[in-house]
Amino acid sequence: MDDIELLNDVLGHTADLVEGVQPGDWERPTPCSEYDVKALVAHMVGWSASFDAAANGHTPKGDPTAYEVTDKSAGEFRLAVTSIVGGWRDHGKDREVSLVGAGGMPGQMVFDMTLMEYLAHGWDLATATGQAMPYSEDTAQEVLIRAEHGPLANEQYRGSDQPFGPIVDVPLSAPAIERFAGFMGRNP
């Protein structure tokens, strides 16, 4: 599977999970301890606009953390992920992009961040809502490899005051999605 197919697979399945959230799910806790399901969906949809802008060569507008869930959120997310995939397909990764405003970041790095962000939060959402885990072993393994060889392998991003918790040891015999969740600081 090439990079664009991988991205389409992760984002498409994650959009399916967002669409699968039921009204009774909003207050459920998630493995991402700072979010319940509603706050997690708000985070995912809010940040999708920034990832969309980066993929399409625009400067992100607005505060992704200010997004509030509505009855249109699943549709907004589906549109954003379609645009994200199209942006990376049309413009490539060999360029600098802006994810959070001023300053450029390597396109490949932001592309990989997109994969990790939405695979991790897709796992969180499926786990919290009881939906079937939609990601294939190959997809999860490829994203795990990228995560293990990227900046998140550095301890400076992990801990109580950092975006990610410590790596949770998961047996090598476990499915790749569980090993990925452990790498991202979740306890599968």
Task: Locate predicted features.
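Extended, alpha-helix-rich binding/interface surfaces that flank or overlap catalytic cores
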Residues: 40
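Glycine-rich loop at the start of a catalytic domain that most often binds anionic cofactors/ligands
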Residues: 44
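Structured surface interface patches that mediate subunit assembly and partner/cofactor docking
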Residues: 2-13, 20-33, 49-188
